[in-house]
């Protein structure tokens, strides 16, 4: 989904990926982000819980844009954060409890997203009004089902 979204704006964009295999090692994430910055990236996006704080720190040090994950991370880099993907775990837990109470819980993969209120995107004031509008239009289309985000769980190098 992330790469598809980026390519919808710029088909020639190159998305680089790095894996830290950690959700807590901020130093490792900072080193991975620094290597990507040295390789020419101009935006850092992480999906690594506390580990991602290191990636944000690298973006701040290099004075490039970054994107938060899991919660509103704008306070970590007020001048650099473009947006934050927010996971509303209370919605996920409520759905799970509801299925147990309704006696229809199954051991399966449950895909909850924006339409369910489980995920949202907080757009920062570092974005121009035009970019905010474009992003919000895409968000609204995802929520309504007009735009479907392909789920691809393939690991990439």
Regions found by a protein language model. Give the residues of each.
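A residue-level marker of the well-folded mature domains of exported/periplasmic proteins
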Residues: 1-157
């Amino acid at each position: 989904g992330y790469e598809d979204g980026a390519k919808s704006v710029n088909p020639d964009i190159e998305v680089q990926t790095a894996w830290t295999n950690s959700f807590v090692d901020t130093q490792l994430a900072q080193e991975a982000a620094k290597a990507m910055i040295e390789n020419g990236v101009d935006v850092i996006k992480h999906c690594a819980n506390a580990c991602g704080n290191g990636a944000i720190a690298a973006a701040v040090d290099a004075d490039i844009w970054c994107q938060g994950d899991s919660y509103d991370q704008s306070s970590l880099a007020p001048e650099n954060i473009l947006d934050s993907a927010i996971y509303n775990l209370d919605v996920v837990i409520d759905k799970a409890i509801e299925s147990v109470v309704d006696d229809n819980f199954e051991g399966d993969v449950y895909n909850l997203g924006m339409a369910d209120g489980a995920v949202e995107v907080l757009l920062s004031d570092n974005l121009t009004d035009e970019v905010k509008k474009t992003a919000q239009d895409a968000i609204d289309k995802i929520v309504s089902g007009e735009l479907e985000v392909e789920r691809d769980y393939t690991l990439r190098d």
